[in-house]
Amino acid sequence: MCQTMRCILVACVALALLAAGCRVEASNSRPPRKNDVNTMADAYKFLQDLDTYYGDRARVRFGKRGSLMDILRNHEMDNINLGKNANNGGEFARGFNEEEIF
């Protein structure tokens, strides 16, 4: 008995959340396309409507990913450290511009 009541409660909550999500999407409907944009005020109003509609969808997400320079810098540091520590051939580590010693 308790298990069926729990299943019914979960189904009701899921349907309520789905209905709330649909209501939010309906309130943010895209502004209609009007071909009767004759004045600058009409065009400005249309652009404002587009900005409010697409504003939350097209904003840049700062802080979500590291910058390209940080990634490249870390990659270079890893390569430098790997080159110094991965000398498995028994040779002496030399610099880039140093000649080979015989």
Curated annotation (Swiss-Prot):
Predominantly, its location class is secreted
Q: Would you indicate the residue range of the signal peptide?
A: 1-26
What are the record keywords, sorted?
A: Amidation, Behavior, Cleavage on pair of basic residues, Digestion, Hormone, Neuropeptide, Secreted, Signal, Stress response
| Tissue expression as described in the entry | Expressed in midgut, brain lobes and ventral nerve cord of larvae. Predominantly expressed in two pairs of protocerebral neurons in the larval CNS (at protein level). Intense expression is also seen in the fan-shaped body of the central complex and two lateral areas of the lower part of the central brain that appear to harbor the giant commissural interneurons of the giant fiber pathway (at protein level). Upon glucose feeding, two additional dNPFergic neurons are consistently detected on the ventromedial surface of the subesophageal ganglion (SEG) of third instars larvae.
One GO cellular component this record assigns the protein to is: extracellular region
Explain what the UniProt record notes about the effect of disrupting the gene for this protein.
Answer: Increased NPF or NPFR activity dominantly suppresses PAIN-mediated food aversion in postfeeding larvae. Deficiency in NPF/NPFR signaling causes decreased alcohol sensitivity and overexpression causes a hypersensitive response to alcohol sedation. Controlled functional disruption of NPF or NPFR neurons rapidly triggers acute resistance to ethanol sedation.
Q: Which compartment or compartments is the protein found in?
A: Secreted
Any GO MF annotation of the entry: neuropeptide hormone activity
Q: Name one GO biological process term.
A: regulation of response to food
The protein's name is: Neuropeptide F
Q: What's the encoding gene here? A: NPF
